[in-house]
Amino acid sequence: MSMLTITIDGKTTSVPEGSTILDAAKTLDIDIPTLCYLNLEALSINNKAASCRVCVVEVEGRRNLAPSCATPVTDNMVVKTNSLRVLNARRTVLELLLSDHPKDCLVCAKSGECELQTLAERFGIRESPYDGGEMSHYRKDISASIIRDMDKCIMCRRCETMCNTVQTCGVLSGVNRGFTAVVAPAFEMNLADTVCTNCGQCVAVCPTGALVEHEYIWEVVEALANPDKVVIVQTAPAVRAALGEDLGVAPGTSVTGKMAAALRRLGFDHVFDTDFAADLTIMEEGSEFLDRLGKHLAGDTNVKLPILTSCCPGWVKFFEHQFPDMLDVPSTAKSPQQMFGAIAKTYYADLLGIPREKLVVVSVMPCLAKKYECARPEFSVNGNPDVDIVITTRELAKLVKRMNIDFAGLPDEDFDAPLGASTGAAPIFGVTGGVIEAALRTAYELATGETLKKVDFEDVRGMDGVKKAKVKVGDNELVIGVAHGLGNARELLKPCGAGETFHAIEVMACPGGCIGGGGQPYHHGDVELLKKRTQVLYAEDAGKPLRKSHENPYIIELYEKFLGKPLSERSHQLLHTHYFKRQRL
């Protein structure tokens, strides 16, 4: 590939042909502001609408200013990024964006994380000289997971890229013109009435408060203050890999112990770990896989393979809408969150000697779809949900700050027994490929009766959107598929329909898996941040004395005292579910 020379603000560098001015500026550590631009190249995600014009620069020999995010470098190009003309243009663009933008920064959920707010501060904009007819054109759209406030939409089109190109859901598109132009569902439908999967990737990339999570922080505070309730909490694997980012701890640092300590200081009666339920999920899902595989190898043509993982609620809703003819293919095992809730409201409530109605189960999740999942009616008993409240990693960070807890100064503490113990197979649920890797560790030993010497399955790891691997289990060679991002899942299922053989497929809706979930601290397009989170979970796995789910002594005890065995009648009643054919609107 030929290299091109470019000079930016007096600094010269060489970049590959096809690079943009913005790409070249990054190699020189020159910060050109952007709003609509988003590039997660390692995940094959990019939004280069070049519509906001905040990134304009002056190119020698050209009359007009050029958007640096979409202008390719030419050889010997000379660029100025901070000339008076450029600065005035950027200020004008920002002033126009603010002309009809709500001025409610003090109470906006995105305050402090809003990229428009940050740029207004950076360029010293204290008032807007333009009157854009500031008024409310749209009602708020509030679903269980997401709140849309389209008066704050700046038409960056990032959410549209994530929804249509990355997730292939097709819910969002540009509508209307002028001051009323926004990105929204067709016919002004509510998100809850569309094929939206609640994955929250639109929220993860929105630069303003137009798309935010539906917060339930106050509901948690009220529950903790209720003397008539026993309030317990579970924390998902990916939370510990990212929580510290919002609480003054360096990215890539595991904060498992500090998180447990903080939750106790918030007032939770018992602090548990969703990792326990991840081990339980492997026992059920792995046993279901071996059962199906055995019947398939024996010639039973009624058995459906590949088995599809069912841990991700965004993925579950996606296949309910998009693949209604495949509802008998996914595992019937509930997600770890819902397994935990079912066990907590039965087994653990019995241990405490209280009715399930007295127990409040709070989940801390990296995922917005978990808010939707816990409200699905099949996950409740007589109107009492297995999981009562779900908050995100971001919401927990806000709660810790609100309660004046010095998070960085907390000592490390352990989770409570019995629902806080886990093996190394559990934390890797938070990364793409982790669920299938954990399942393979257990499936191998249950199927062969032999000890698995090498527990790391490197072929299913990594940030590739689609991965395929062949794994030897006894005399059988299993073909495994892994996808993260719903568009990649759609692509992976195509060869299945065309007759290509897979025995098991793992799907996670979010880029990188749960570490890139819609409820995690905002990554602002930094793929390296996602990689650091991944490393935290693999390190936690490697540091555990037990690394296979079936070795968890508390899981063994749970089966001996309560469930009987995997796939037993009680296990099916509490730990398995069914799926629904949903309309495609």
UniProtKB/Swiss-Prot annotation:
Share the entry's pH-dependence remark.
Optimum pH is 8.
Question: Keywords for this entry?
Answer: 2Fe-2S, 4Fe-4S, Iron, Iron-sulfur, Metal-binding, NADP, Oxidoreductase, Repeat
| Chain positions recorded as [2Fe-2S] cluster binding sites | 36, 52, 55, 69
Give yes or no: UniProt keyword Iron: yes
Q: Which InterPro entries match?
A: 2Fe-2S_ferredoxin-like_sf (IPR036010), 2Fe-2S_ferredoxin-type (IPR001041), 4Fe4S_Fe-S-bd (IPR017896), 4Fe4S_Fe_S_CS (IPR017900), Cytosolic_Fe-S_CAF (IPR050340), Fe_hydrogenase (IPR009016), Fe_hydrogenase_lsu_C (IPR004108), Fe_hydrogenase_ssu (IPR003149)
Q: What is this protein called?
A: NADP-reducing hydrogenase subunit HndD
Q: What lineage is on file?
A: Bacteria, Pseudomonadati, Thermodesulfobacteriota, Desulfovibrionia, Desulfovibrionales
* Record-listed [4Fe-4S] cluster binding positions: 101, 105, 108, 114
Reactions it catalyzes: H2 + NADP(+) = NADPH + H(+)
The prosthetic group or cofactor this protein requires is: [4Fe-4S] cluster
Presence of the UniProt keyword 4Fe-4S in the record: yes
Q: Where are the transmembrane segments?
A: none
Q: Which SMART domains match?
A: Fe_hyd_SSU, NADH-G_4Fe-4S_3
Q: What does this protein do?
A: Catalyzes the reduction of NADP in the presence of molecular H(2) to yield NADPH.
Report any Pfam family annotated for this entry. Answer: Fe_hyd_SSU
Q: Which residues form the 2Fe-2S ferredoxin-type domain?
A: 2-85
Please summarize the record's notes on activators and inhibitors of this protein.
Inhibited by oxygen.
Every 4Fe-4S ferredoxin-type domain range: 144-174, 185-216
> Which Gene Ontology MF annotations are present?
2 iron, 2 sulfur cluster binding; 4 iron, 4 sulfur cluster binding; ferredoxin hydrogenase activity; hydrogen dehydrogenase (NADP+) activity; iron ion binding
Which top EC class is given?
oxidoreductase
PROSITE patterns from the UniProt entry? 2FE2S_FER_2, 4FE4S_FER_1, 4FE4S_FER_2, 4FE4S_HC3
